[in-house]
Amino acid sequence: MEAGIGRGILYDREDVRDSEDVYAAYASMPVFLDREASHRYQLFCVRDDSMTDGTRDSLCIGDILLCREVFREDWTHGLIGRYPNVVVVTEEGILLRRLTKHDRKQETISLHSLNRGDEDRIIALQDVKAFFYVERLIERHLSQW
């Protein structure tokens, strides 16, 4: 399988609205999975310290993350799952955070930053353009530790 690197707040802003065009525009690299992949996967490169708290749970600047997209029609089933870290794409950019709550009645998600300097956020699902579970840390430079 090949997954591509996208753009957004985690990396340089791109004003392209069609996600298919955005995904096709950037480089990809082979990623080996231990199962057959039927979903769309995307690589994201961490560009800020919002998920860094000094623990082994940290996702550091420069880390490459393999993320699986959750399609909009599946959002009603509940987004809290076995992958706590998520990438959320909105009009304002892309956020890497920990998903702490999915309120299906209010149609919102609550996102938590590991960095104490960043505030938690509540985002309306109507404002979400794409939603990804962070499944795997693909690459980390040892200089981050």
PLM feature spans:
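Short, positionally conserved secondary-structure boundary motifs
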Residues: M1-I61, F71-W75, R140-W145
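Short, hydrophobic/aromatic-rich segments at coil-to-beta transitions
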Residues: S38-L43, I80-V86, T108-S110
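Structural motif
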Residues: C60-I64, P84
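Residue-level recognition of conserved beta-strand edge/terminus positions
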Residues: C67-R68, V89
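Short, compositionally biased
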Residues: T76-I94
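Short beta-strand-centered aromatic/proline hotspots
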Residues: L95-K101
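Amphipathic alpha-helical interface segments
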Residues: K105-W145
